[in-house]
Amino acid sequence: YLEIEKLSKLLSSSKSEHILTRSLTKVPETEAETRRYIIDVDLKLMGWEFEGPNKNVFEEFKVANPYIPGGPNLSVDYVLMGRDGKPLALIEAKKTSRNINDGKTQALAYANALEREYGQRPIIFLSNGYETHMWDDLEWNMRRVSSVYGVSDLERLIVRRKLDKPILSTIPINDNISARSINT
């Protein structure tokens, strides 16, 4: 617990320092500016690699069109790959003035296409640079997060998703417990 608390304080202090030293000369007006000036910076701070031998961020990543079979491919704003070469997450970016929910349907289609192609469903992130939401549509509702997660955290979420979970209908019911009167 002490290690977690120490790490939390370290990250909190570096975040405050980053906020103080980071300045934007102008507010990003387009999606491209939002991506370059805000989202790209945040991804790099979380350890994601945009180039080189350890590249794991792929921008404008092409996926099969789920709406028109054989139609033109669609472009996912960002696909974040794991060490196994499978997609851990996708990010649907919007410009700062847009509601991030505007990209929800689009992101869901991208997740479906990536799952069909790679056999692994990615975690979905929606971001307009100022607000980021994470959504694992297989496990839980969308929720606001402070940033896109790093590689290790996303890999852990994917592994947890794959763990064997007993299906309640397959667990035998002990009638000696369930059929008795509560007041006896």
Where would I find each of the regions flagged by the language model?
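ATP-dependent helicase/translocase motor core
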Residues: 1-184
